[in-house]
Amino acid sequence: MTTFTVIIPARFASSRLPGKPLADIAGKPMIRHVWEKARRSGASRVVVATDNEQVKNAVLQFGGEVCMTSEKHNSGTERLAEVVEKLDIADDEIIVNIQGDEPLIPPVIVQQVAANLAKYRVNMASLAVKIEDVQELFNPNAVKVLTDQAGYVLYFSRAAIPWNRDEFADIAANTKNLDDLRLGDHYLRHIGIYAYRAGFIKRYVQWQPTALEKIESLEQLRVLWYGERIHVELAEEVPAVGVDTPEDLEKVRSILTAF
C-alpha cells in the first residue's frame, strides 16, 4: 500500500460562507468530518493547515494535528508549501491535498490518487469522472480535463473540451437543443483532489503565475505550462457535493444526519 501524508487546507474566511470549517454538521465541525475521512484513507499522517486560531483549537480538541500558516497566501498550494517546509517533510514523500470543505469525500479516492502518483512516477496526479449531464459540460464551474490515451493531461478548461465542431456549432447557432446531444466517454470533469511529491510543491510555488492559468482561473495549468506532466485516472467512487454555499451546507447536513 502506498504511504502518503494528507494535508487539509482550512481557511476560516470565506466570502460565501464565513467560518466554513467550523460549520456544524451532525454534531461535529465540518473540518472534523474531512479529517475523519482522511484518517480512514490509510494516510500515515493527516495535518490540517490553517491561519485561524479557532480552527486550530477545534482540531486540537478532537485530537488532530495542526500547522499554523500565513494569512497572506494567494493559493492553497502556497499553504501546502509552507506546511512542507515547517514540518520538514522529505522531498520524496507523497502529499495528498484534500480541501477542508469536502466532508463527503470518499476515503477510497484519497488512497487512489496517492497510488496513481506512485504508479506513474509523475510529480502530480489527480482524478476525474465522466460527464453524463450535458448541462454540466457547458457549466464553467465544472472544470473539464482532456487527457491522452495513457491518462496524461493535455489541458484543463472551464470550456467544453474537446469541442465537437459539428454538434456544438448547431447549439451555438440555436438550431439544436442541448438535451439532444449524446456525450462520448472522452468528456471528463476534473475532481479537485491532488497528489504531489513534497519537493515538487516547493518547486511549484517558485514558478511565476502564467497567462493560461489567469485566463481560465485554474492554478493547475501552471504545471503544464512549465513542462511537467499530470496523470489523471477515473475516480473509483464519485464524490458527493462539496460545501461552497449555505445551500450546499444544508444538502450535506441532510445527507450526514440521515446516517
From Swiss-Prot:
Catalytic activity from the UniProt record: 3-deoxy-alpha-D-manno-oct-2-ulosonate + CTP = CMP-3-deoxy-beta-D-manno-octulosonate + diphosphate
Cytoplasm found in the keyword field: yes
A Pfam family per the record: CTP_transf_3
GO biological-process terms attached to the record: CMP-keto-3-deoxy-D-manno-octulosonic acid biosynthetic process; lipopolysaccharide biosynthetic process
Predominant cellular place of this UniProt entry's protein: cytoplasm
Gene Ontology cellular-component annotations: cytosol
Function of the protein: Activates KDO (a required 8-carbon sugar) for incorporation into bacterial lipopolysaccharide in Gram-negative bacteria.
Protein's name in the database: 3-deoxy-manno-octulosonate cytidylyltransferase
